[in-house]
Amino acid sequence: RAGDDSRYGFIAIADPQIWAPKEFAKLAAAADDIAATVRSYGGMPFHGICCGDIVSHDHSLYGRYNEVMERTGITFRNAMGNHDMKVYGRSYETSFSKFEQMYGPVYYSFDVGRIHYVVLDDNFFIGRDYFYIGYLEERQMRWLEKDLARVQPGSTVVVCLHIPSTCEEQDRKQFRYDRAGSTMTNHRGLYEILKPYRAHIISGHTHTTFNQPIAP
């Protein structure tokens, strides 16, 4: 119905990880596929998000990525991935400067229809070149508590971030999960904040697809 934002489609992608200009042909094909999917719904509004690793450390490719994603015909928001960090600075606080220059804050929220969306940054650069852990800083935890204070308990909340908060055991075996950079080390704090809501967490990082129930 015209003006009705309670019915819409949502598309999540992750880890396009563009490392060279020649990779954009593959991204264009994926963008065209998204556009075809959107058209197949006969005018239903859509929005999307990329859950990080937009590029593979060459942040000069952000502009071209944005141009190619316009082919989808829908608004795409972005979460930051570990490859989107500047992982050669002196501190965590300097690691997200390139991302913020292009896309704005690394954590934010928005509403579409009756759904509240939250985007977080759980890539924590530890000050040694290319080393990071999955960790949600206290500043974001406190911000999230304030943000959700205006959301009715029992409402649906969708959290988008890059490094998964948890994984199934069978999926752990495919990756280096002995490394603290593979999952969010302090995920219990996030789960506690989300407990009053019908929460769904969407992430990337592992280059595979799985669904992991968290709450009983």
What are the language-model segments listed below?
Residues R1-G63:
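N-terminal active-site segment of His-dependent metallophosphoesterases
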Residues F10-A12, C50, N78-A79, V159, ...:
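Residue-level marker for buried hydrophobic side chains located in beta-strands
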Residues D15, G52-D53, G81-N82, H162, ...:
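Active-site glycine-centered loops adjacent to acidic/histidine catalytic or metal-binding residues
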Residues P16-W19, N123-G127, S165-C167:
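A short, flexible beta-alpha/helix-coil linker loop
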Residues I18, V55-S56, D84, S165, ...:
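Short active-site segment of divalent metal-dependent hydrolases/proteases
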Residues C51, V151-Q170:
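Short acidic, glycine-rich surface-loop motifs adjacent to enzyme active sites
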Residues H59-T156, R176-H200, T208-P216:
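Extended active-site neighborhood of metal-dependent phosphoesterases/phosphodiesterases
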Residues R172-Q174:
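Core regions of peptidyl-prolyl cis-trans isomerase
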